[in-house]
Amino acid sequence: IEIPEDRSAFTRAVETMAVGAKRHFALVQLVMFGVFLVVVGVPPLLPDPPAEATILGDPTLFLKYLLWGVWFPLVFLSVILFGRIWCGVLCPMGAASELANTHGLQRPIPGWIKWEGTPALSFIVMTLYGQTLGVRDHPGAAAGLFGGTMLLAIVFGWLWGRNKRVWCRHLCPIGRVLGLYSRLGAVQFTPKVRLAGGDAYTERGICPTMIDLPRKCESRHCIEC
């Protein structure tokens, strides 16, 4: 990939870093998957912390803090700083869904998944589920929420789309929220020559979130893969 000389120094630095780091994406995603398993899967196996326990002295509280006090805030902060690079490079659910898709049935995406209200419905259902079970206070409930979401991402990726991230575009519970924050992102990728007509949806191109790249105007669906 050639980096044009007329770009700003910052833009060229970001592009060069992204191109050079792409060969390490699989390793990064594998590490993030391991972190996900530890942060989500280990706390339910540990005993309940005593009343006098602290974050630094109790592994359950420490992992709980990593999930809700570090992981989630950094996801939203990263979107503001770098766009949705979390979704395309770091998210273990998106990576697992994409991997499942490469070995899956790759069926056409049904209309009910493409419905504009599907992401909002997904967000509402997951939020109500999490609040009802108290996922922030009960590690088992958190493991059920995130583990179930991971399973759904894999199943939907295995069933539908051809080399696409159907889960990320249409079904991720926080995808639209991150898309809203990405409008503030300091880093965005745009076509060098943009065609007229505004943003368009297409399953024919190489974009995993079905963006018609030559007509791309917005960053909300771009996962910076």
Label each residue range with its predicted role:
Residues I1-I211, R220-I223:
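Membrane-embedded alpha-helical bundles of multi-pass integral membrane proteins
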